[in-house]
Structure formats: structure tokens, C-alpha cells
Design a protein with these regions (language model features):
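Acetyl-CoA-dependent GNAT
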Residues: 61-66, 124-126
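A short beta-turn/loop motif at secondary-structure boundaries
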Residues: 43-45, 67, 103-104
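Short, charged/polar, Gly/Pro-enriched secondary-structure boundary elements
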Residues: 56-60, 69, 117-119
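Vicinal oxygen chelate
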Residues: 1-10, 14-22, 48-54, 66-142
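Hydrophobic alpha-helical segments typical of transmembrane helices
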Residues: 60-61, 85
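Core segments of cupin and vicinal oxygen chelate
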Residues: 7-12, 18-58
Length: 142
């Protein structure tokens, strides 16, 4: 975002989800094994951690209840090979919420739940498709 200062103590992403886990260290290890996240900053042994993935993805793992919020949360994680990433997550112990599916809008995705019940949509772009080609409407640029 133009005009926003960066800080070496905070993730540079414009939007950073903060997810609560009962065991921060176990969550960090699991997210690394299942999704390839890398720990960037650790705040205490069990209080909080900042993780990165890819060139611009970030998530904060915070100490807290294992129960996800009552609102339906979903964190979307874009990957280069969704079939491999989905299998990796399941092999690490993720629960399948919805199997992989190829969508008319050019994405292939599936949803898994992690060790604390947070849902992750793993997605891969398989082709560039105009929103108008599948019933959407372009209303502004990215």
C-alpha cells in the first residue's frame, strides 16, 4: 500500500490474519509441515509468532482458545501445485472439509481444517478467466 510505513517488527502484508491456537509452538511447527510457512518473528516461547509464506503472505499465530470464532472463517492460501499442497496438508493431519474441485472461474481448490479447526482454502490458478465468462462482473481494477 502506497504511503504506508514498513516496520521490521511487523508483517509487510496489507491484510494479516491472526489465528488463535492453544499451543503456539505446535501450531508453528504444524503450519510449516502442512503448508510450508516459515517463522519470522517469535514473541515469547508460547505467546505469539509471525509466519510468512511465498513472497507476500503472512499470518500471526497467537495464544488463545482452540475454538475458531463463531463466524465462518476461511484463510485462502494460493499455491503453485494445489494437488501436492492438499496431499501435504492431509498427510500432516489436516481434516478434509471439501475435496479439491476445478471451478469455472479458473481456480482449483479444496478446504482443510488444521489442528485447531481453522479452515484453509488451498487454491491454484489453472487459467485466466474474465469474470464475465462465468457470470461475474468486473467493477474495478486490482
Amino acid at each position: 500500500m502506497v504511503g504506508v510505513l514498513t516496520n521490521r517488527s511487523a508483517p509487510p502484508a496489507t491484510v494479516t490474519p491472526v489465528l488463535a491456537y492453544p499451543d503456539v509452538r505446535a501450531a508453528v511447527e504444524w503450519l510449516a509441515a502442512a503448508f510450508g510457512f516459515e517463522e519470522r518473528v517469535r514473541i515469547g516461547e508460547s505467546h505469539r509468532a509471525q509466519l510468512r509464506v511465498g513472497s507476500d503472505g503472512a499470518v500471526v499465530v497467537a495464544e488463545g482458545s482452540s475454538a475458531p470464532t463463531t463466524a465462518p472463517e476461511l484463510t485462502k492460501l494460493r499455491v503453485p501445485d494445489v494437488d501436492e499442497a492438499f496431499a501435504r496438508a492431509v498427510n500432516a493431519g489436516a481434516t478434509v472439509v471439501s475435496e479439491l474441485q476445478t471451478w469455472e472461474y479458473g481456480e482449483r481448490s479444496g478446504v482443510v481444517a488444521d489442528l485447531a479447526g481453522h479452515r484453509w482454502e488451498l487454491t491454484q490458478t489453472i487459467r485466466d478467466t474474465a469474470p464475465e465468462d462465468w457470470g461475474g462482473t468486473t467493477v474495478g481494477p486490482w
